[in-house]
């Protein structure tokens, strides 16, 4: 499933992802698969977006599980996601250097990871999502939230009190998506939930 050129990144990231939130590893796999299988008209730069998909939530491995409720779910604090983004950027930088990944591409990968959930920082949102790769990744990352497995994982982990609470929040977030094609897909998935 993983193209060989990204396998060293995956191998180094996998154990750290397992130490994060309960579904971080599965989420990384799903976002990566969505990017690899995408057949639409968006310009997909796999050399940037696949490493980002693998490592974007890797910073959760440094957050104690009892504090996940402050970064995900109904009890999420405003700007609560900032810690995992900045920690994740450092971990990603180390992994990319260890595997000898292209330096220029690494810079962009690290920058996307450092602010991939910047929609939590609402006043800075336009400034943070200033490249096509950032906007594309944001929407592909969000796309995985709109499925039964992810909702069940969040409910099981206690990140939301009820399915209705989670669906309400997800419905409100549709307008945060940048790409009409993804918005349409998300709206369809919401109707099926």
Where do the PLM segments sit?
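Active-site alpha-helix of zinc metalloproteases
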Residues: 48-52, 112
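Catalytic glutamate of the conserved HExxH
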Residues: 57, 61
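Divalent metal-dependent phosphate-bond-processing catalytic cores, especially two-metal-ion Mg2+/Mn2+ enzymes
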Residues: 4-5, 18-47, 55, 65-66, ...
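Acidic helix/loop microenvironments that form the catalytic cleft of cell-wall polysaccharide enzymes
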Residues: 110-118
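Active-site metal-coordination segments of metallo-dependent hydrolases
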Residues: 17-30, 74-87
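Metal-dependent catalytic cores of enzymes that make or break cyclic nucleotides
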Residues: 62-80, 123
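An active-site-proximal "capping" alpha-helix that borders the catalytic cofactor pocket
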Residues: 31, 36, 82-99
């Amino acid at each position: 499933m993983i193209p060989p050129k990204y396998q060293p990144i995956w191998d180094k990231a996998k154990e750290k992802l397992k130490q994060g939130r309960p579904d971080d590893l599965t989420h990384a796999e799903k976002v990566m698969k969505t990017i690899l299988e995408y057949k639409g008209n968006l310009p997909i730069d796999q050399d940037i977006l696949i490493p980002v998909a693998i490592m974007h939530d890797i910073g959760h491995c440094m957050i104690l599980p009892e504090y996940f409720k402050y970064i995900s779910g109904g009890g999420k604090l405003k700007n609560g996601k900032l810690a995992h983004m900045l920690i994740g950027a450092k971990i990603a930088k180390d992994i990319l250097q260890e595997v000898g990944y292209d330096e220029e591409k690494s810079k962009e990968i690290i920058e996307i990871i450092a602010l991939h959930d910047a929609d939590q920082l609402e006043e800075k949102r336009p400034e943070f999502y200033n490249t096509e790769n950032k906007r594309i990744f944001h929407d592909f990352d969000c796309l995985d939230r709109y499925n039964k497995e992810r909702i069940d994982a969040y409910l099981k982990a206690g990140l939301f009190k009820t399915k209705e609470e989670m669906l309400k929040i997800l419905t409100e977030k549709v307008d945060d998506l940048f790409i009409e094609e993804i918005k349409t897909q998300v709206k369809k998935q919401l109707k099926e939930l």
